[in-house]
A protein has these predicted regions:
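Enriched for short, Lys/Arg-rich terminal
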Residues: 1-11, 69, 76-104
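Glycine-rich, flexible loop/turn motifs
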Residues: 13, 29, 53, 61-64, ...
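Conserved phosphate-interacting/catalytic interface
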Residues: 48
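Short low-complexity stretches enriched in small and charged residues
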Residues: 44-45, 54
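A short, surface-exposed loop/turn module that caps and links secondary-structure elements
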Residues: 52-76
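Amphipathic alpha-helical interface surfaces
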Residues: 18, 37, 41-44, 64, ...
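Arg/Lys-rich, positively charged N-terminal/basic patches that mediate binding to nucleic acids
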Residues: 1-44
Length: 104
């Protein structure tokens, strides 16, 4: 499954999702996420889909890009807000297993 957005001559890809709720949000469908989270989460998904490199996600600094540890070793996350994270694996310049998680 390739989800592709085209802007000019560039193509940005989210390869796949780690859960159905995040995929539904990306596709504009109703989800279980709190209503106050939805627009900010969509903005972060768009940011992720537009990144050419992992380092692109360091801006803005409020993303707080970090490599995860423990059972999520190999994944990275950016902050949606104080409670929610967008977690993903970055492989070959693309985002894989993208999911929105409640870290509390």
């Amino acid at each position: 499954l390739h989800l592709v957005l085209k802007y000019g001559t560039s193509i940005f890809v989210i390869e796949n999702f780690g859960d159905k709720a995040t995929e539904k949000l990306w596709n504009g469908e109703r989800t279980r996420f709190p209503s106050g989270l939805i627009q900010r989460a969509i903005d972060k998904l768009n940011m992720l889909s537009s990144a050419h490199t992992l380092e692109d996600l360091r801006i803005p600094p409020s993303n707080r890009l970090e490599a995860l540890k423990g059972k999520r070793v190999g994944q990275h996350s950016i902050r949606i807000n104080d409670q929610w994270r967008l977690c993903f694996r970055w492989v070959g310049g693309n985002a894989h297993e993208v999911e929105i998680t409640d870290c509390h």
